[in-house]
Amino acid sequence: MTDTNDRMTKLQTMHQRAPDDTFLIYAIAMEHKKLGQLSQAIEWLGRVVEKDPTYCAAYHQAALTHEESGDLEAAKKWYRDGIAAAGRKGDTHTMGEMQAALAAIE
């Protein structure tokens, strides 16, 4: 078993024990992204924001992952939603990063 598979197995096991832990869900998403499994990464990032609509990093990573897969329209939507979430949360730094990224693809 490779280190990456071992990490994914451990994350999945922890997730079974704590299914509402958004950090674990985010970690699983990022592991999928690292493996090049972009659609799975996006699915898991969607789960993060379903559980915590203020988890700004999930919006940003979902947008970046959509960009990587070539779906710029979906990326724009994730950026816009993330900018709104960051604004509600008062996270001006992340909001600025996503605004700049959105401007770069519009």
Model-predicted regions and their roles:
Residues 17, 50-51, 68, 85-89:
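Structural marker of alpha-solenoid helical repeat scaffolds
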Residues 13-14, 47-48, 82:
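Canonical positions in the second alpha-helix
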